[in-house]
């Protein structure tokens, strides 16, 4: 005979068998509210609407069950069965897998709703998000391993418009500054004295009136851009045409190298800005270090221009003196004493990751220039060695103290054990033959006589009262 039960009734019976097979002390313990729902739906599916009287106050559990059942009203049995199965679907994932649960899953079938991606039609959301991350612009800065993409509707349009306006303003400012600097250079060339011509020399890749633009992503400057443009260039003082030509050629070559290196650095950083190919914390630390380096360069360039206007430039010869042939063989290093001291202090404050950069910059031809940075490194190594030796001595002292404390505690424990043994031996009398103490034996012998005497006194008083 074929099974003629409807599908919802078969599912309902399988769900009821699962609930009835739950152990009382099992890993899954449904709440009271959940059990009330199952009870009310079960009663409604098997007996129909509630027609019984409400239990008395002495049965609070029965009253709660009656209220839950009565709240369903005139719900049909089929709807109650379907609601029972729907409630079971909500908790079936948290229940342990048993034979009853497997039977229920086979009867219910797949009850998950598959939602397709409407935008792409195929491919999951994870792959689309991964593709958006990989194809995002390099302007999305990676912080704590999360890329902040700039493709978010109206906000991205506003940001692009603001960026275009900012670029236009920067270009106009740069054009004005270049025109102003060209006019100043012409005025300086027309003057008879050539001592103040050092103002037009490009120091650290920046002119006197230039400014530093700090972007959102500070990139590390190449070593070619950090070196001095006027280093190791012998310029005769009496020939301004040769001097300006040599300086302009060196400036042009250095600017080309600097732009190429900066483009390469930006290309590399743009490829490694995503959260997949780099460590966000290391990238964030490098960005902060490069940001501080740009600020220091800007401050130092201002100091250079002020000192160069005063004429306090230092020659490349020994002890700052000119060679024997007057102005010939004079080397413009483009550094003042104040600048060199400030630069050394800034390099010493840089983190350990900038050691290679400072080492490359320190290869100039000065006797008192950047090569003096190797001294503090040696002193730092010596200080580290001294600190390690002192730390080792302190550890040895601590170990010795711990050993002495262990020896003292062991000796104290042994002495206490010996004292307790001696006291127990002293308490026991030497010639006592019994295993119990004398006091206990005396009490065991005397107490019957005491009780007999008390009973005798009590009986005498009672007789006196009767007479």
Curated annotation (Swiss-Prot):
<comment type="similarity">
    <text>Belongs to the ATG37 family.</text>
</comment>
<dbReference type="GO" id="GO:0005777">
    <property type="term" value="C:peroxisome"/>
</dbReference>
<dbReference type="InterPro" id="IPR000582">
    <property type="entry name" value="Acyl-CoA-binding_protein"/>
</dbReference>
<feature type="domain" description="ACB">
    <location>
        <begin position="8"/>
        <end position="97"/>
    </location>
</feature>
<feature type="compositionally biased region" description="Basic and acidic residues">
    <location>
        <begin position="335"/>
        <end position="347"/>
    </location>
</feature>
<feature type="region of interest" description="Disordered">
    <location>
        <begin position="119"/>
        <end position="204"/>
    </location>
</feature>
<keyword id="KW-1133">Transmembrane helix</keyword>
<dbReference type="Pfam" id="PF00887">
    <property type="entry name" value="ACBP"/>
</dbReference>
<feature type="binding site">
    <location>
        <position position="65"/>
    </location>
    <ligand>
        <name>an acyl-CoA</name>
    </ligand>
</feature>
<dbReference type="InterPro" id="IPR035984">
    <property type="entry name" value="Acyl-CoA-binding_sf"/>
</dbReference>
<feature type="compositionally biased region" description="Basic and acidic residues">
    <location>
        <begin position="312"/>
        <end position="322"/>
    </location>
</feature>
<feature type="compositionally biased region" description="Acidic residues">
    <location>
        <begin position="170"/>
        <end position="187"/>
    </location>
</feature>
<feature type="region of interest" description="Disordered">
    <location>
        <begin position="219"/>
        <end position="240"/>
    </location>
</feature>
<feature type="region of interest" description="Disordered">
    <location>
        <begin position="304"/>
        <end position="376"/>
    </location>
</feature>
<dbReference type="InterPro" id="IPR022408">
    <property type="entry name" value="Acyl-CoA-binding_prot_CS"/>
</dbReference>
<dbReference type="GO" id="GO:0005737">
    <property type="term" value="C:cytoplasm"/>
</dbReference>
<keyword id="KW-0446">Lipid-binding</keyword>
<dbReference type="InterPro" id="IPR014352">
    <property type="entry name" value="FERM/acyl-CoA-bd_prot_sf"/>
</dbReference>
<feature type="binding site">
    <location>
        <position position="84"/>
    </location>
    <ligand>
        <name>an acyl-CoA</name>
    </ligand>
</feature>
<feature type="binding site">
    <location>
        <begin position="19"/>
        <end position="28"/>
    </location>
    <ligand>
        <name>an acyl-CoA</name>
    </ligand>
</feature>
<keyword id="KW-0576">Peroxisome</keyword>
<keyword id="KW-0175">Coiled coil</keyword>
<feature type="compositionally biased region" description="Gly residues">
    <location>
        <begin position="352"/>
        <end position="372"/>
    </location>
</feature>
<feature type="binding site">
    <location>
        <begin position="39"/>
        <end position="43"/>
    </location>
    <ligand>
        <name>an acyl-CoA</name>
    </ligand>
</feature>
<keyword id="KW-0072">Autophagy</keyword>
<feature type="coiled-coil region">
    <location>
        <begin position="382"/>
        <end position="411"/>
    </location>
</feature>
<dbReference type="GO" id="GO:0000425">
    <property type="term" value="P:pexophagy"/>
</dbReference>
<comment type="function">
    <text>Acyl-CoA binding protein which acts as the peroxisome receptor for pexophagy but is dispensable for aggrephagy and nonselective autophagy. Binds medium- and long-chain acyl-CoA esters.</text>
</comment>
<dbReference type="GO" id="GO:0005778">
    <property type="term" value="C:peroxisomal membrane"/>
</dbReference>
<keyword id="KW-0813">Transport</keyword>
<dbReference type="InterPro" id="IPR016347">
    <property type="entry name" value="ACBD5"/>
</dbReference>
<keyword id="KW-0812">Transmembrane</keyword>
<keyword id="KW-0472">Membrane</keyword>
<dbReference type="GO" id="GO:0000062">
    <property type="term" value="F:fatty-acyl-CoA binding"/>
</dbReference>
<feature type="transmembrane region" description="Helical">
    <location>
        <begin position="439"/>
        <end position="459"/>
    </location>
</feature>
<feature type="compositionally biased region" description="Polar residues">
    <location>
        <begin position="125"/>
        <end position="139"/>
    </location>
</feature>
<protein>
    <recommendedName>
        <fullName>Acyl-CoA-binding domain-containing protein 5</fullName>
    </recommendedName>
</protein>
<dbReference type="GO" id="GO:0006631">
    <property type="term" value="P:fatty acid metabolic process"/>
</dbReference>
């Amino acid at each position: 005979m074929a099974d003629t039960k409807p599908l919802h009734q078969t599912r309902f019976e399988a769900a009821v068998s699962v609930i009835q097979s739950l152990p009382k002390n099992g890993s899954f313990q449904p709440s009271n509210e959940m059990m009330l729902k199952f009870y009310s739906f079960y009663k409604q599916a098997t007996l129909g609407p509630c027609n019984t009287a409400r239990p008395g106050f002495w049965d609070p559990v029965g009253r709660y069950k009656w209220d839950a059942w009565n709240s369903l009203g005139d719900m049909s049995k089929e709807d109650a069965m379907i609601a029972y199965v729907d409630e079971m679907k909500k908790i079936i994932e948290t229940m342990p897998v048993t034979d009853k649960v497997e039977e229920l899953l086979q009867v219910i079938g797949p009850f998950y709703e598959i939602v397709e991606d409407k935008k792409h039609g195929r491919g999951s959301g994870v792959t689309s998000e991964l593709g958006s991350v990989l194809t995002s612009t390099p302007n999305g800065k990676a912080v704590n391993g999360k890329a902040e993409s700039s493709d978010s509707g109206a906000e991205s349009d506003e940001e692009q418009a603001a960026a275009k306006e900012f670029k236009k303003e920067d270009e106009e400012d740069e054009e004005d500054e270049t025109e102003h600097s060209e006019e100043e250079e012409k005025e300086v060339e027309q003057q008879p004295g050539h001592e103040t011509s050092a103002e037009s020399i490009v120091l650290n890749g920046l002119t006197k009136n230039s400014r530093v633009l700090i972007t959102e992503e500070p990139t590390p400057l190449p070593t070619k851009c950090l070196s001095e443009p006027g280093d190791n260039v012998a310029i005769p003082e009496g020939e301004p045409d040769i001097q300006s030509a040599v300086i302009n050629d060196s400036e042009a070559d250095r600017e080309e190298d600097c732009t190429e290196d900066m483009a390469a650095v930006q290309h590399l950083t743009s490829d490694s800005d995503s959260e997949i190919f780099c460590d966000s914390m290391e990238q964030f630390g490098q960005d902060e270090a490069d940001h501080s380096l740009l600020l220091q360069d800007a401050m130092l360039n201002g100091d250079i221009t002020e000192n160069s206007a005063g004429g306090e430039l230092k020659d490349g010869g020994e002890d700052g003196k000119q060679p024997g042939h007057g102005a010939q063989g004079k080397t413009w290093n483009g550094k003042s004493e104040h600048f060199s001291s400030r630069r050394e202090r800034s390099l010493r404050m840089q983190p350990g990751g900038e050691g290679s950069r400072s080492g490359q910059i320190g290869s100039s031809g000065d006797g008192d220039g950047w090569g003096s940075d190797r001294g503090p490194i040696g002193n730092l190594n010596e200080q580290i060695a001294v600190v390690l030796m002192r730390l080792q001595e302190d550890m040895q002292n601590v170990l010795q103290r711990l050993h002495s404390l262990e020896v003292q505690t062991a000796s104290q424990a042994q002495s206490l054990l010996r004292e307790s043994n001696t006291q127990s031996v002293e308490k026991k009398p030497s010639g006592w033959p019994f295993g119990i103490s004398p006091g206990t034996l005396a009490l065991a012998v005397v107490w019957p006589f005491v009780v007999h005497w008390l009973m005798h006194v009590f009986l005498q008083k009672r007789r006196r009262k009767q007479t």
